[in-house]
Amino acid sequence: MKELKTITQSKLYAWEQNRNMQNVFKTENLESYILQHYKGFWSGFKSKVSSKDLVSFTKAWVQYCNNYWNIFYKSLVDEKGCTEEQATKIANKFRGNVGEILAEYILTEFGSYIDKTTYDPVDPSNERFVDAFAQSKDGVDVNIQVKNFSGELDYLAFYKLAMEGLVYLYKNPDKAEGFLKRPRQVLLTFTNTVFSKNEADYRLAVNVIGPSEIDNFFSNKDYDAWIDACDCILDNLENVK
């Protein structure tokens, strides 16, 4: 499955550029080990989660992800000789990365879950933070926030990003390049009490593309592969060799 390998290797490359991680990767040679854990993580997740229901899907995701963090952390310490500090950093990065991929998946599949949406800026005079409210078909309240670091994201751009998904940007580069000048995050916070009183447990973040990714996706016309990869991760992992 080429898409999975591409995603995981690009994530690992980003980790290697992080100064806090460089020594860990160089001394422990963990690249192939972490790639194996990626495959194990997604295979296990697919076997436990098959529902299109947003409540059960997200609850299962958080429970599985937290449990896997403990397993991965322990394996880094016991099998790879990492210090507790090193193992914590790597396991946190791992959890953050799989969280990003899941958030991307939910955004691209938004229409399958969401029944109605409204748009309400946090501060109409400051487009740095813009919010939308959505309600899923099974009654889950979802707050969607775009942290717009450079302040140039207008209403239409936000609506296309949050409501119709990142796919819109990749298929409409003429509209995307005008405002994707700085990296930003999309935060999905599931606030319904059926999840948890601690809303942070159910917050998914995805880093939206910045200048270098614009070059990669739009110049190479690689967005179809990206779209397919999100589905492949959850649907076709039994074919990974």
Walk through the language-model features, giving the residues of each.
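Interdomain/boundary linker segments immediately adjacent to catalytic/signaling cores
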Residues: 1-102
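Catalytic cores of nucleic-acid endonucleases
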Residues: 141, 146-216
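Non-catalytic C-terminal interaction segments of nucleic acid-processing enzymes
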Residues: 207-241
